[in-house]
Regions:
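Short linear motifs in intrinsically disordered
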Residues: 64-71, 132-136
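Preference for bulky hydrophobic residues occupying beta-strand positions
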Residues: 89, 118-120, 187-189
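Generic short beta-strand segments
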Residues: 92-98, 119-125, 203-207
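A short beta-strand signature
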Residues: 109-125, 139-142
Length: 228
């Protein structure tokens, strides 16, 4: 299973919440000690706080260095493990075009448009029988294309607008799903002619994910990307 973590997601989230709680308590104890002028207690508490920070960020570094980069082929899925690994993403198709749309609503690429069809699927095998058939709302996603020179390319606003005007943008990525459901989304990127070996990175855009042990958004963690 290709995922966006290399530590069990519930463990990573619990470690994050636990570390935040411990650091908050130690911070309050240190603040109180300073207010009542118990400087010895404040010093010890701050040393403990620094120790917790060092251990936590040390664990982030260990799991990041143990991670590996993966480039997925057409149709291979990447599961997003936010707590449970319910949502799976894959690249279903890629087509190239110089122009998207017709008439006044058309958009012309500076280089070449890559129109990427991304499939989102709620993997029903990842749920328990007790979960039911309720909808799942995807968290915000960040989508970026990288080439072999390390250059980055965001979604083209002009190309995306032209695709939407033509009625070909598909289903928005934040559309909720029920178990077993799937949909496709068309995303446009404007790449220069010399962009070699482009890959698409789909990841979470929430800030706290950068501080979760084993999450691909954490510092130095390798990524799981899609070949275009």
């Amino acid at each position: 299973l290709n995922t966006n973590v290399n530590l069990s997601a519930p463990v990573g989230v619990l470690c994050f919440l636990g570390a935040c709680f411990v650091m908050a308590v130690l911070g309050l104890v240190a603040l109180h000690a300073l207010v009542v002028r118990r400087f010895g207690r404040a010093r010890v508490t701050l040393v403990l706080l620094a120790g917790v920070l060092a251990v936590y960020f040390g664990l982030i570094l260990v799991f990041s260095l143990a991670s590996g980069e993966r480039v997925l082929a057409r149709g291979e899925e990447k599961h997003f493990c936010e707590i449970d690994c319910h949502l799976a993403y894959s690249v279903a198709d890629v087509r190239r075009a110089k122009t998207i749309g017709d008439g006044a609503g058309a958009a012309t690429a500076r280089g070449e448009f890559y129109v990427v069809t991304v499939k989102t699927r709620f993997d029903e095998t990842t749920i328990s029988p007790r979960r039911g058939n309720g909808q799942l709302y995807p968290n915000p996603r960040s989508l970026t294309v990288f080439d072999d020179k390390g250059m980055t390319y965001p979604v083209s606003e002009e190309g995306q607008r032209a695709l939407a005007d033509a009625g070909s943008a598909g289903t928005p990525l934040d559309t909720p799903l029920r178990p077993g459901e799937s949909y496709t989304t068309e995303l446009v990127f404007d790449l220069p002619p010399d962009a070699g070996d482009p890959v698409l990175l789909i990841n979470e855009s929430d800030l706290p994910t950068h501080f979760i042990i084993g999450h691909e958004n954490s510092p130095l963690h390798k990524k799981t990307e899609f070949k275009l």
